[in-house]
Amino acid sequence: YLSYAISISTVIVAILGPVLGAVADHKNRKKPLFTFFMMMGVLGCAGLALPSGIIAFLAVFVIAKVGFSGSLIFYDSMLVDVTTDERMDEVSSQGFAWGYIGSCVPFVISLGLILGADQIGLSGTAAMMIAFAINAAWWGLVTIPLLRNYKQNYYVESKGHITAKQSLSQLAEIFGEIRNDRKVLLFLLSFFFYIDGVYTIIEMATSYGKDVGISDTSLLLALLLTQIVAFPCAILFGKLTKQFETGSLIMVCIGAYFCVAVYALWLDAA
């Protein structure tokens, strides 16, 4: 059922994404749209802490996932507004690195609650519910500095209220330009298949791990270790962009990712 919920949320974002992106290109639109989807994700995450049946839980999960994925549409595009082309790789890698290590704070707290639930008089379900609430609160709090300081510097000038027709017209124009630019078209197609595979592995890794016999505790610790290892690696690759082409480094990472994924495919037991 989890895979169906993930697929539904992905389809929703895929449909909304191009239109939302076109709207966000206009002046002072990016931050409000980001805030809306971020709050949808935060409230959805908090909603997962409420007791409910499997269907209600999955419905709230879809809302949270759409909020999270939708917010990334605008969050990722903010990079051009906060740095220069020369520093883009470095700033991006620093953002990923500190995001990875920062996420360990609520993760460790939640992990302590879940693994030590019996010692502090909590049921496993109660500990999990509190963990969802903690992560929702953390998500909302760490977004405040961005909301206070971000300013959209690059935008499309528009006269008056932006209509859906204008956004669709702009979108059609963009698609026309993409169709006539072979490099951009190939890049977008490649990125679509690449990122779809990456996110599928990330989101289904724990389910796959359970199927091959890895315990819940081991899976949680593995996820935590992944975040910790990702911190120095992100910084390292940011520095390597000064010595090597970004495209070459990306190919190295994709190659390593592919090898690990193929190896995992043949696992039949932990």
Task: Show which residues each predicted segment covers.
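C-terminal ends and interior cores of transmembrane alpha-helices
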Residues: 35-53, 255-270
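Helix-to-loop junctions at the C-terminal end of transmembrane segments
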Residues: 15-29, 232-246
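Short amphipathic helix-loop junctions that connect adjacent transmembrane helices
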Residues: 1, 203-219, 223
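Juxtamembrane intracellular "pre-TM" segments in multi-pass secondary transporters
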Residues: 151-188
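Pair of pore-lining "gating" transmembrane helices in MFS-fold secondary transporters
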Residues: 1, 62, 176-201
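C-terminal membrane-cytosol helix-exit motif in multi-pass small-molecule transporters
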Residues: 106-118, 136-156
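Glycine-rich segments within core transmembrane alpha-helices of 12-TM secondary carriers
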Residues: 90-114
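Hydrophobic core of transmembrane alpha-helices in multi-pass small-molecule transporters
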Residues: 44, 54-71, 270
